[in-house]
Amino acid sequence: DLVVGTGGYVSGPILRKAAQLGIKTVSHESNAFPGVTTKLLSRYVDEILLAVPEAKKYLDPKCKEVVVGNPVRESIVYADRQKAREKLAVGDKICIVSFGGSQGAHRLNQAMADLMAWHTKKGSEFEGKIHHIHATGKYGVEDFPQMLREKGANFEQNPNVDIREYINDMDDCLAAADLVICRAGASTLSELEAAGRASILIPSPNVAENHQYHNGMVLVNNNAAVLIEEKNLTGESLCKAVEELVSQPQKLLS
C-alpha cells in the first residue's frame, strides 16, 4: 500500500518502480541539502518529507513536500534537567558536552584538549567553573589523555573533567548541558533543537555534498548555534568561541 524511502541510493530504484506501479510513495530527507536520490525522486514520488524548510529550494518545484522534522527519542525531549545535573555531579557549574561520533575525530580531540587546558588552568578565570564531559570516540580513547598532558591540562582526579570513549546517556548529558560542541549530522542537530541547547558546530568535511555545513547553517541563521569549519578549527578559535558564550549566559539561553 505504501513504500517509504529515506534518501539512500538503494531507495532510488525501489521508489521509482513503486511509483511506476501506482503504489503510493514517500521519501524522507533528513538533511538541509538533499542528496542526489532525493532530488531525482522529487519528480516522481507522491510526497517528500523534509526535516527543514530550507531544503525545498533544491527540489523539483512541482513536487509535493511536507516539513515534518526528524524523529527524536522521547527521552531527549522529556529528560529532567535538574535530575540530570545531579546525576552527573554538575552542580551549579557551566556544563559543556562535546563529542565527535563513535569513532572519534582527531581534529576535534586536539581542539578539545586545548579547550580543557584553557578552562582547567590553575588561576584562570574559568578554573572550577566549567564541568566538561567529552567523548573521545574509539580511536581517541588512548591518545586523548596524552594530548591533555602535553598541553598541561589539569584533568587527572579533576571532578569537573569527565572523559569517556562514548556517551551512552545522551539524554541526561543534553539535559544537563549549557553548551554542546559537536558535528552537524541531521539526527544530532534534531536532538539539540529538541533539547533546546546552544551549540558550537564543527561540520565534518568528509560527507557527501558538504551536507553537514548546510545543516549547521540552518541553526546559525536562526541564532541557535555558532559554526566553525574544520579548516578554521584551532584550539585558539574554539576557546575564543566558548569564552564569548560562557561569558554572556544570555547567549546560551537565547
Task: Report the location of each language-model feature.
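Acidic donor-binding loop of glycosyltransferase active sites
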Residues: 2, 167, 171-189, 197-198
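An aromatic- and histidine-rich active-site surface loop
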Residues: 2-21
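Short glycine-/small-residue-rich Rossmann-like dinucleotide-binding loops
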Residues: 7-8, 101, 137, 185, ...
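Active-site-proximal region of nucleotide-activated glycan assembly enzymes
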Residues: 18-82
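Short alpha-helix at the nucleotide-sugar/activated-sugar donor binding site of glycosyltransferases
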Residues: 19, 42, 174, 192-193, ...
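Donor-nucleotide binding loops and adjacent catalytic segments primarily
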Residues: 81-83, 89-179, 213-217, 221, ...
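Short hydrophobic beta-strand element within catalytic cores of glycosyltransferases
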Residues: 182, 198-209
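Conserved donor-nucleotide binding/catalytic region of nucleotide-linked donor-dependent transferases
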Residues: 226, 231-254
